[in-house]
């Protein structure tokens, strides 16, 4: 899975996992939609979204640039996070660029390390 999730008590933890920089691809977008549905069905009080490894998410996966766009599209994923009944919190480290920045902005709250790059 490009995205993994688990819960501890009433808190969900969703982790982006597409090494080396968590580039956002179609599988990750699909998994994020599934994670939002999971969080709502579990009745969680909050979800913390973070990236495994050295980045939160460094933007779009360049391997998909020359291919036709496949649903779900990033704006649909961001909208699903924004409108979720469960508040999402982006825990940002490393880089959150392009689509990674959009994912972070789609969360209700954001917290970042002092050395994080968002753009």
Write out the residue ranges for each language-model feature.
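Glycine- (often His-adjacent) and acidic-residue-rich active-site loop
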Residues: 50-80, 96
